């Protein structure tokens, strides 16, 4: 990596159509804040930019359901989420809005520049039009039957039952959500961004980061690149959003697609931050200086938007320029998912713990620490109330809080609240803690985004400090050797300071309270200054003889009793019971036998044994596999919605049951010549039916 003088950290914009939950916090906002606070603690020049994503169809649907305007919807959730972030200690330097005029101006500027260069393509396509409502229908406004699993309530963008990504025109029996009428296909023109034009440049960009990006990010991005990048629409027929800024009849009633608009918020919000800081050109130092570094914190469901699409937009802007060139992200630390009590967070089923509601009951730092210790870096993790209780009580209260309080109380009671001894560097280094190595480990962990390790290292120091104080027994030693007890307490107080510094990025409010108990004026945030590294202070004792601490200690963490989490556990029981009822109802529906058919009707279905010769994922359809089958002497291609449960490699060589005389159809631009049989288990997993036997390929199943 090149020499870096400043760092710009961005976080994926939460959608202003609902409250953020703990899964969002764990995946994006907390790790970003911990990283930013560490960079500040090192004295580095870093800014933290975030904001609300306030455009898109789900917002207009919510507004129509509630009989209010889209602006009312985003105002509500922007306020709610920004306040929840503030209470949680997420320290944005600027938290913007994509509905702001400043953002609209930036997005239009990018559109016009890329349009001026002739990069966009205009394409006429057939989209559904609701004649009753007199408007084109975006994907979420169309519902119908899924062509893969026959779910009658599939949406125009995805079937929630089988997970297949769809387009509205693939639905069977489509209906408009606006009028319940059957929509008709009409021609409409849209602007497209040619991602394929930048394929080679994007491949080189990803290759340059294959050793410093997380493997999941590199692998997922390369899967898309391997499939080949296609043109992607950047406009849609909608009234809510950023209007296409052209004096052109074809631009009327069209807005920028949210995938193009939202990522530009990182730039527009940085511009707005600079303007409010009194220097309208300051943003350029973070976006356009080659010695600046951009880091995008995201969840794994946002990877390609930040490793392919956003970089391609910036490449399009930079093309042919000698100045005003934007930096591409230096790292895109995408997390896995944090689940809740063994299941995925689900807003639609209200199976979630919302951040604002959580903070009404429990302190922010207990949550920050619990999530940091369970950060989903390389695999999905799980938030449970029991684990939260155990970490708060056993680690924060009994280990960290207990040590701090004992140290402050004993100093106040036996040494009049004054540091009683001047510790030397040699004294500091015989504690059993290698401070140079600790600083090196912390720095490596932060720079590699190992959030769990950073929190764990801090708690390891707390355990060592607690052990040192307990084994030294100053309450006994003081009776015979006051100086030895004084030395113990001076070292303990310096350990309190070291813990405040070490754990500041993870539990900043608690670090500030420790800092205040140690007798320092002002806040610990004010102590963290650009150009001065607080982390280097760990190398030597910082509290010297005669320094006065605060006379009163405080309990840093109140233990969480069973009664405190009992309402939450009961709430989970109800949510799980409701989910089980839905699953039981679905199972009951599945167990209802279909109407009786005649034997002649049964004979019409031609079931054959087929062998899978090849398998691959279908482009931009995460749940579909394209199977190449051998059926006797014939070759067939079949699409199957099983990619979530079987890898292509697992399918090759399997014998499957093929519905051989099913009418051919086109799905996602691919021909499917039949259907293979699978069974859905109670857990939702699809299991392919595999006939067993030798030399049965092509044989009819009777």
UniProtKB/Swiss-Prot annotation:
<dbReference type="InterPro" id="IPR004495">
    <property type="entry name" value="Met-tRNA-synth_bsu_C"/>
</dbReference>
<dbReference type="GO" id="GO:0005829">
    <property type="term" value="C:cytosol"/>
</dbReference>
<dbReference type="InterPro" id="IPR023458">
    <property type="entry name" value="Met-tRNA_ligase_1"/>
</dbReference>
<keyword id="KW-0648">Protein biosynthesis</keyword>
<protein>
    <recommendedName>
        <fullName>Methionine--tRNA ligase</fullName>
        <ecNumber>6.1.1.10</ecNumber>
    </recommendedName>
</protein>
<keyword id="KW-0963">Cytoplasm</keyword>
<keyword id="KW-0479">Metal-binding</keyword>
<dbReference type="GO" id="GO:0005524">
    <property type="term" value="F:ATP binding"/>
</dbReference>
<feature type="binding site">
    <location>
        <position position="149"/>
    </location>
    <ligand>
        <name>Zn(2+)</name>
    </ligand>
</feature>
<keyword id="KW-0030">Aminoacyl-tRNA synthetase</keyword>
<keyword id="KW-0547">Nucleotide-binding</keyword>
<dbReference type="InterPro" id="IPR015413">
    <property type="entry name" value="Methionyl/Leucyl_tRNA_Synth"/>
</dbReference>
<dbReference type="GO" id="GO:0000049">
    <property type="term" value="F:tRNA binding"/>
</dbReference>
<dbReference type="InterPro" id="IPR029038">
    <property type="entry name" value="MetRS_Zn"/>
</dbReference>
<dbReference type="InterPro" id="IPR001412">
    <property type="entry name" value="aa-tRNA-synth_I_CS"/>
</dbReference>
<dbReference type="InterPro" id="IPR014729">
    <property type="entry name" value="Rossmann-like_a/b/a_fold"/>
</dbReference>
<dbReference type="Pfam" id="PF01588">
    <property type="entry name" value="tRNA_bind"/>
</dbReference>
<dbReference type="GO" id="GO:0046872">
    <property type="term" value="F:metal ion binding"/>
</dbReference>
<keyword id="KW-0820">tRNA-binding</keyword>
<feature type="binding site">
    <location>
        <position position="162"/>
    </location>
    <ligand>
        <name>Zn(2+)</name>
    </ligand>
</feature>
<feature type="short sequence motif" description="'HIGH' region">
    <location>
        <begin position="14"/>
        <end position="24"/>
    </location>
</feature>
<comment type="function">
    <text>Is required not only for elongation of protein synthesis but also for the initiation of all mRNA translation through initiator tRNA(fMet) aminoacylation.</text>
</comment>
<feature type="short sequence motif" description="'KMSKS' region">
    <location>
        <begin position="344"/>
        <end position="348"/>
    </location>
</feature>
<comment type="subunit">
    <text>Homodimer.</text>
</comment>
<dbReference type="InterPro" id="IPR002547">
    <property type="entry name" value="tRNA-bd_dom"/>
</dbReference>
<dbReference type="InterPro" id="IPR033911">
    <property type="entry name" value="MetRS_core"/>
</dbReference>
<feature type="binding site">
    <location>
        <position position="159"/>
    </location>
    <ligand>
        <name>Zn(2+)</name>
    </ligand>
</feature>
<keyword id="KW-0436">Ligase</keyword>
<dbReference type="InterPro" id="IPR009080">
    <property type="entry name" value="tRNAsynth_Ia_anticodon-bd"/>
</dbReference>
<comment type="similarity">
    <text>Belongs to the class-I aminoacyl-tRNA synthetase family. MetG type 1 subfamily.</text>
</comment>
<feature type="binding site">
    <location>
        <position position="146"/>
    </location>
    <ligand>
        <name>Zn(2+)</name>
    </ligand>
</feature>
<keyword id="KW-0862">Zinc</keyword>
<keyword id="KW-0694">RNA-binding</keyword>
<dbReference type="InterPro" id="IPR041872">
    <property type="entry name" value="Anticodon_Met"/>
</dbReference>
<dbReference type="Pfam" id="PF19303">
    <property type="entry name" value="Anticodon_3"/>
</dbReference>
<dbReference type="InterPro" id="IPR012340">
    <property type="entry name" value="NA-bd_OB-fold"/>
</dbReference>
<dbReference type="InterPro" id="IPR014758">
    <property type="entry name" value="Met-tRNA_synth"/>
</dbReference>
<dbReference type="GO" id="GO:0004825">
    <property type="term" value="F:methionine-tRNA ligase activity"/>
</dbReference>
<feature type="binding site">
    <location>
        <position position="347"/>
    </location>
    <ligand>
        <name>ATP</name>
    </ligand>
</feature>
<dbReference type="GO" id="GO:0006431">
    <property type="term" value="P:methionyl-tRNA aminoacylation"/>
</dbReference>
<keyword id="KW-0067">ATP-binding</keyword>
<feature type="domain" description="tRNA-binding">
    <location>
        <begin position="601"/>
        <end position="702"/>
    </location>
</feature>
